[in-house]
Amino acid sequence: MTGLDRERIVDGAPALSAEELQAALAGLPGWQLAGDGKSICREWRFKNFKQAAQLANLAAWQAEAAGHHPDIAFGWGHARVSYSTHSAGGVSRNDLIMAARLDAATG
């Protein structure tokens, strides 16, 4: 999904179909559909707490800038970020954009 990280967040974006979502996730390595089928998530492993906190803070800063906020969990050596568009009742293109932005920022 080249360029997905440069797309605009759009208010009122609808939930994606299962087919659209699976195709999009193929272009976002490491991201997967959560068990509830209504969010995407990715987990990272780190060598210490500081690196996990840095990723959580990066995701938070990006979310504030875009006005689209994930669920973030982290602890010693791990972090998990989950995106969902609650108003759409599932995963929208906005969630994919934010996942791509986080990937682009983390290399």
Curated annotation (Swiss-Prot):
NCBIfam families: PRK00823.1-2
Family that this chain belongs to: Belongs to the pterin-4-alpha-carbinolamine dehydratase family.
Protein name (Swiss-Prot/TrEMBL): Putative pterin-4-alpha-carbinolamine dehydratase
Residue ranges the record marks as coiled coil: none
EC class of the enzyme, as a word: lyase
Reactions catalysed, as given in the entry: (4aS,6R)-4a-hydroxy-L-erythro-5,6,7,8-tetrahydrobiopterin = (6R)-L-erythro-6,7-dihydrobiopterin + H2O
Record EC number: 4.2.1.96
Keywords assigned by UniProt, alphabetized: Lyase
Organism annotation: Paracoccus denitrificans (strain Pd 1222)
GO MF term set: 4-alpha-hydroxytetrahydrobiopterin dehydratase activity
SUPFAM superfamilies named among the record's database cross-references: PCD-like
Keyword Lipid metabolism: no
GO biological process terms on file: tetrahydrobiopterin biosynthetic process
Pfam family, one: Pterin_4a
HAMAP family in the cross-refs: Pterin_4_alpha
